[in-house]
Amino acid sequence: MLDLAARVAMRGVGAVEPNPTVGCVIGREHAGGVEILAIGHHGRFGGLHAEAEALRVCSERGIDPAGATAWVTLEPCNHQGKQPPCARALIDARIKRVVYASPDPNPVAIGGAGALREAGVTVDESDESDAAIRSSAPFRYRIETGLPWVVAKWAQTIDGFVATSAGDSKWISNLFSRRSVHRLRAKVDAIVTGIGTVLADDPLMTARDVPLRRLARRVVVDPKGRLPLDCQLVRSVTGGAPLTVAVSPSVLERNADWYRTLLERGVDVVAFEPDAEGRFVIADLLRWLARERQVSTAMVESGPKLLGAMHEEGLLNQLLVFIAPTLLGDPAAQSSVGGSPIASIAGAARYRLDHMKRFGDDVRLLYRATD
């Protein structure tokens, strides 16, 4: 049942953040299995939570859920926010048993399991559904670390290159793969890139030709303040697509006219102090995005330098890799991720393959960082 709740929960991705995606199944347990009474998911920010939605469906169908079991991907909340406490709703509905996959780490909402037990409800935390645990991972990660969940995306050739030695990369992946990227852009809170990608490609970095649930914030890591004022990213701000440019503090004085012009055009320009070695600290930017702009999920679409820096800071939660049926065989071509040399394979980072999908002759691989 938790696997089903997880599938239902994913319907809310891109519509509920910064809240968690949550799914709920209410059913009656019998010797021969489970009779499903209702399912529900958190469908939009500010809307009914998954448990309340499932109970609403029961009411709409004239079903009394008393004595039933509720399977929920995340521990029911125990606070009054935009919606009343889910724990109280389950108690009032006389639910007999609640099974949840992950405890709620939010200090504002914790305590649901305890409240249910005090009311006589049997409560079990279950780790049997990896899908249910993963469904709320971005939310739990942000609450526990103060960082958004980061997905690094790139397209590469069979031999692992993202561009030729001359810098050409259009297009490695096919049309179907690129359309899937636009669908993903429509579901994340932010899209992060580096100034090198902007100068080379002048990208727009918006979701196009797909249903839009939100306009993702475009974020450019630009320590030296080189973003062209006439680039597509800046021009599109007036159309409602937000833009943040992350710079070093010295830029604000050295490029005062540039800074003022960007502010006048509605661009966020935020300065971050470098580390002791003068390097831009990407984690500081990500924490600011999570805290000040409520970014829960961010997708990185950049060149190897920024990806390598984020990898070395341990900031990549998932890798979304498109492999195209193209072989370059170019020793000077650009690899997907930069970084410092590693002497042995044993010292390399390991990721777990979560999902694989084919788009024509392209293959999309989704990897997750191991604990």
Question: At which residue positions do the language-model features occur?
Answer:
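Flexible, gly/pro- and Lys/Arg-enriched active-site loops
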Residues: E312-Y351
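Short gly/pro/ser/thr-enriched loop/turn and capping motifs at secondary-structure boundaries
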Residues: P105-V108, L199, R226-P228, L252-E253, ...
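Zn2+-dependent cytidine deaminase-like catalytic core
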Residues: I26-A131, R217, T244, P249-V251, ...
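Residue-level signal for inorganic ion chemistry
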Residues: A5, G23, C77, L116, ...
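Short, basic/aromatic recognition patches
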Residues: M1-E17, R142
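Conserved histidine-centered catalytic loops in small-molecule metabolism enzymes
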Residues: G339-D371
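Short beta-strand scaffold segments in enzyme catalytic cores
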Residues: T21-G32, W154-A155, L365
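Active-site ligand-binding patch in enzyme domains
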Residues: Y141, V151-W154, I158, V162-Q294, ...
